């Protein structure tokens, strides 16, 4: 597998090192003495004792206010502000994740136990939505590969399927207009994609546990794919030998595919993917636009996964 090399970052995106280190010192102090990583089962954010990893980029992140108020999470509503407005009743704790299917050691795992077993890393990734907007987000989490190693996939396993929780009493979008979707929300990856070092199970961002609107308490982050692959509030992970269909692929197969790799050369049927609107940047005239990079800037690390594939046909 190619060694990791950070995507090229424009100088305008760089955060001064002294400011970055002060933030880390503050978060580290806040995490000292914490009895539980999430606090007493509250939905409010709690500090995470995350450590920097080799994937940590010294980028200027999207402001926290934008990251937590401009979201797609249809379980809570259709508008970008709905998840923040409508997710207050959602209870992210206690939480377990069931891992089953083609594995030697299936099980149902307590999330807080997993967070103690696997070191929490801080990684800053670009996030590119299929709607042609983007953010730069400092995530906290552990590699999906760590959990997969724990359950020991069988040699016959080829894919990994993911499932979101169904709680219509706490997630109003599941009983509103979008109840026509086949809940639960589901997603999938090839096993080699799931095991790639960049693929993260995020449990926090900006050094704190995930807010409900960002996918609390655990979500998938695959930085070279469009954001809809980042399934939120995961309760089940299944290893299989069949390619799983994702929710949007089932709903509209002409517009959404299985792979969803960021590709400026393959337009969405209704808009161009050649550039993106960076949320949190720009002034009076709106957010600035950036050229979209193949695989969202991670081509050196992941392009080999798709060698010989027709990326237009396998969108």
Curated annotation (Swiss-Prot):
Its cofactor is Mo-molybdopterin. It comes from the Bacteria. One of its GO terms (biological process) is protein repair. Its EC number is 1.8.5.-. One of its GO terms (cellular component) is periplasmic space. Keywords: Metal-binding, Molybdenum, Oxidoreductase, Periplasm, Signal. Mo-molybdopterin binds at residues 71, 74-75, 129, 164, 214, 219, 230-232. The keyword Secreted does not apply. Pfam families: Oxidored_molyb. It is an enzyme of class 1 (oxidoreductase). One of its GO terms (molecular function) is oxidoreductase activity, acting on a sulfur group of donors, quinone or similar compound as acceptor. Part of the MsrPQ system that repairs oxidized periplasmic proteins containing methionine sulfoxide residues (Met-O), using respiratory chain electrons. Thus protects these proteins from oxidative-stress damage caused by reactive species of oxygen and chlorine generated by the host defense mechanisms. MsrPQ is essential for the maintenance of envelope integrity under bleach stress, rescuing a wide series of structurally unrelated periplasmic proteins from methionine oxidation. Belongs to the MsrP family. Heterodimer of a catalytic subunit (MsrP) and a heme-binding subunit (MsrQ). This is Protein-methionine-sulfoxide reductase catalytic subunit MsrP. It comes from Rhizobium etli (strain CIAT 652). The lineage of its organism: Bacteria, Pseudomonadati, Pseudomonadota, Alphaproteobacteria, Hyphomicrobiales.
